[in-house]
């Protein structure tokens, strides 16, 4: 059931910012941007649409996709840490930054160690952690294609502004640890599980749509100028907020329900088809 939308009139392009989730949305199941989708995105960027790669990944884990789309040349942004940071790919400038409260780094790490859960964070090169051989640290390294560096004492090592601490551990223990953390750090941090073995600990109120709102405001635009594509629960606020919220064919039912349009799945150029339809097709 494809929603029928009125075509915009005149030559003023309505969607000036295009926010894309990565895994399950921009990339197929082999984590590749398929040719039709890549061509559509590059054409959109060349028309002046600002492409925002939006993910819970660290900045360093998104950079290869930004390079592949040539956003450093064509213009675009990386929204990392689920909205904790937005950088301009052309200038390298930080446009939005939500810093993890420095005074909570030690308490979170101490709590994690007590429950046999490993904390990690990121620097410009990759992961920083107290146990680089931990299999779940290895999983985060593999997902982002980044190395892990081992340090003796993580809180002592962190001398730069971080955007999140990721806690990794046995999926059997994680629901309990998540619950305890939410009690202990209530009103101080945003805490949720992003995978059975991952607990994200973030500054309060950080999520994709809130950071996109700041970016749009900086550009003198509003949600009506935003098109967003996603597939997972963490994309829900962004899909609801955008003037054109697009759900992938492989999206969870809640995202499909919230979206204005449902496109093909990530194995069949869902993003490319939606960009062709709403951005590249000339207004009639």
List PLM regions with ranges:
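Non-catalytic pre-domain segments flanking phosphatase-related domains
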Residues: 1-20, 39-42
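Short, structured coil segments at secondary-structure junctions
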Residues: 69, 74, 82, 185-187, ...
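Hydrophobic packing residues within well-ordered alpha-helices of enzyme cores
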Residues: 37, 62-66, 177, 181, ...
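Mg2+-dependent phosphoryl-transfer enzymes with acidic/Ser/Thr/Gly-rich catalytic loops
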Residues: 13-17, 34, 200-284
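Asp-based phosphoryl-transfer active-site loop
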Residues: 16-30
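Conserved acidic, metal-coordinating active-site core of Asp-based
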Residues: 111, 115-229, 233-235, 241
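Active-site phosphate-binding/coordination module
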Residues: 35-136
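Short active-site oxyanion
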Residues: 48-52, 76, 164, 224-225, ...
């Amino acid at each position: 059931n494809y929603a029928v939308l009125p075509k915009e009139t005149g030559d003023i392009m309505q969607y000036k910012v295009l926010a894309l989730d990565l895994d399950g949305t921009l990339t197929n199941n082999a984590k590749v941007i398929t040719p039709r989708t890549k061509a559509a995105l590059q054409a959109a960027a060349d028309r002046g649409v600002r492409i925002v790669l939006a993910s819970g990944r660290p900045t360093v884990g998104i950079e290869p996709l930004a390079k592949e789309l040539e956003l450093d040349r064509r213009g675009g942004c990386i929204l990392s840490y689920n909205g904790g940071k937005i950088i301009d790919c052309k200038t390298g400038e930080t446009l939005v930054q939500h810093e993890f409260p420095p005074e909570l780094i030690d308490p979170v790490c101490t709590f994690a160690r007590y429950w046999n859960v490993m904390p990690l964070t990121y620097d410009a090169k990759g992961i920083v952690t107290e146990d680089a051989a931990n299999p779940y640290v290895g999983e985060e390294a593999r997902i982002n294609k980044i190395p892990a560096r081992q340090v003796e004492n993580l809180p002592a090592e962190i001398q730069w502004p971080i955007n999140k601490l990721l806690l990794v551990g046995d999926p059997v223990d994680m629901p309990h640890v998540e619950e305890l953390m939410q009690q202990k750090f209530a009103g101080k941090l945003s805490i949720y599980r992003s995978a059975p073995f991952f607990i994200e600990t973030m500054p309060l109120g950080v999520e994709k749509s809130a950071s996109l709102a700041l970016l749009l405001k900086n550009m003198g635009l509003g949600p009506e100028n935003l098109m967003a594509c996603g597939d997972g629960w963490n994309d829900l606020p962004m899909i609801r907020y955008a003037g054109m919220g697009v759900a992938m064919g492989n999206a969870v039912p809640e995202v499909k329900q919230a979206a204005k349009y449902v496109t093909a799945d990530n194995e069949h150029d869902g993003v490319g088809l939606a960009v062709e339809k709403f951005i590249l097709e000339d207004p009639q």
